[in-house]
UniProtKB/Swiss-Prot annotation:
Induction annotation: The last gene in the rpoZ-spoT-trmH-recG operon.
Catalytic activity, as annotated: Couples ATP hydrolysis with the unwinding of duplex DNA by translocating in the 3'-5' direction; ATP + H2O = ADP + phosphate + H(+)
Domain Helicase ATP-binding as annotated: residue spans: 283-448
Locus of motif DEAH box: 397-400
BP-aspect Gene Ontology terms: DNA recombination; DNA repair; replication fork reversal; response to radiation
High-level lineage: Bacteria, Pseudomonadati, Pseudomonadota, Gammaproteobacteria, Enterobacterales
Family from the record: Belongs to the helicase family. RecG subfamily.
NCBIfam families assigned: PRK10917.1-1, PRK10917.1-3, PRK10917.1-4, PRK10917.2-2, recG
Effect of K302 to A/R: No longer catalyzes Holliday junction (HJ) branch migration, has no ATPase activity, still binds DNA, dominant negative to wild-type in vivo but not in vitro
GO molecular function: ATP binding; ATP hydrolysis activity; DNA binding; DNA helicase activity
The protein's name: ATP-dependent DNA helicase RecG
Subunit record text: Monomer in solution. Probably a monomer on HJ DNA. Binding to fork DNA is facilitated by SSB; the proteins do not seem to stably associate.
Record domain Helicase C-terminal: where: 482-628
Amino acid sequence: MKGRLLDAVPLSSLTGVGAALSNKLAKINLHTVQDLLLHLPLRYEDRTHLYPIGELLPGVYATVEGEVLNCNISFGGRRMMTCQISDGSGILTMRFFNFSAAMKNSLAAGRRVLAYGEAKRGKYGAEMIHPEYRVQGDLSTPELQETLTPVYPTTEGVKQATLRKLTDQALDLLDTCAIEELLPPELSQGMMTLPEALRTLHRPPPTLQLSDLETGQHPAQRRLILEELLAHNLSMLALRAGAQRFHAQPLSANDTLKNKLLAALPFKPTGAQARVVAEIERDMALDVPMMRLVQGDVGSGKTLVAALAALRAIAHGKQVALMAPTELLAEQHANNFRNWFAPLGIEVGWLAGKQKGKARLAQQEAIASGQVQMIVGTHAIFQEQVQFNGLALVIIDEQHRFGVHQRLALWEKGQQQGFHPHQLIMTATPIPRTLAMTAYADLDTSVIDELPPGRTPVTTVAIPDTRRTDIIDRVHHACITEGRQAYWVCTLIEESELLEAQAAEATWEELKLALPELNVGLVHGRMKPAEKQAVMASFKQGELHLLVATTVIEVGVDVPNASLMIIENPERLGLAQLHQLRGRVGRGAVASHCVLLYKTPLSKTAQIRLQVLRDSNDGFVIAQKDLEIRGPGELLGTRQTGNAEFKVADLLRDQAMIPEVQRLARHIHERYPQQAKALIERWMPETERYSNA
């Protein structure tokens, strides 16, 4: 193995890695020894010195050593093993809920034990629940760790101890095999070498300040952060360069349809809408595919911008596809576009996963023949059996639900006769600038930063759940006395449609009993699209006073007469999602209110979140705060897609580096194409597939 590059050494060559463990490691994208070395600790534990048991404070993680006094199993309520140890300064109780007979036998009275865990205050003094422990041999001095102990991101069935043992082997291989230095010499001068940085981060010496590691300021981290941010930026440059190699249909100015639609509208587009449409039209006139992200706050009128872009393509005899994240939103878009486009003689088709049999087949034929010029749907519109007829523009609504990989797969899908469609991506989740510069560096960005006239800011109040009866009275007053409509939103912490639906049904029953004079509707994610649509339609037509809903109404629902929203358990949602929900009211000229009905006690973070919503109606301010509170991955909705999942970099903490990283990435992209490719392969193997497309 001597002299081999570690990206070519499979993990199966390490001792103890068989087929079963290989499969588990593959789930966290660990295939080679290089992958393992770049799988960095989440945090560290200091197990290098002993704490006297008598000095343990609650909440402190510590290593203690003591002699076993007794070890007992109790069966009251829950089966449990307790073991007491003493070091002369005090007694510690170790509690285990999962244990075996072998564990009980190893902890015999008189044995010496080294244990590590979080100290808690128990009934009989200090205790630790499920500490890691080791029975000591006959040594008079305990065997303490010589380095800080790493804690790695892991997956089911892979223990920390396994990852530590494998990493030990991988670090040993650094002596005989190479991990390639990919930074050009002018960049890496004065920096730690890559092997040095990896050794330091996997096995930090006890002299190293934990605070340096926790804040990401250690030179070993800075070395890897720079490399990872460069790889990310280089992948975006490669995607952009790739896009420039493709051909799109140039769609020159043809404003006949656009002017007809504008003349029929009861309002004039805002200056911001007009500016963004001009930016889009400029892109669509070119023979390379447009890749543009349009950000607009809730209610800023993105749908009209999308419609005007669509008309440019349709005027040239081409097709347009609009993809939305949910069937409810897709159907609402289809209805909006039909209202605008039918008078212009344009046929709008709708395609969703739930459509079956003849109806689906008929819709597919209408798309393939070109009879339908505008196709609206969920991701179902990009399934194999859907054939387009001159698709020239793809519009993706709520980009934030689709990661970089979906964005690219969709693009490959749309190409026909050597042409790639133009792409327009719309999000109502404003993205802070530093994040947009990094996560969407392959896209040009437009911002609709002006609300249409006649919108009123929503007044937001936070009220404890103990005053629920007062809030129900407030709903009665708004609906009966003021003639308004209201939403009551149920949220659940579990990502479970079933539990969420059950919670909404229970609330619906409660409110029907409490408000017998009101017509109360219910909509949740487990209802059939037709049922949801019927409820939404009767709410929109004013037949229902109150709509009980889950977060399915988060995006796109437009009922101007609704001026009151109650959000239950708002502490369970992020700021961006709460702001989206709140955007369902305040769509008419009447003063609107949003009540955040929270459960006490509130955590510090939840208090900050609710305060931000009370203070601001500006989506961009809220997004920046959300980034500060939650971190970039959650904000981009990419915990699943891996788009913002960095191994060592942190977009919030490292944002000051981003402008310099972008400059360096351009330098490497132009001067060192081989290194650029290798950096992307090392840090972002998924993206590499696409930049070669």
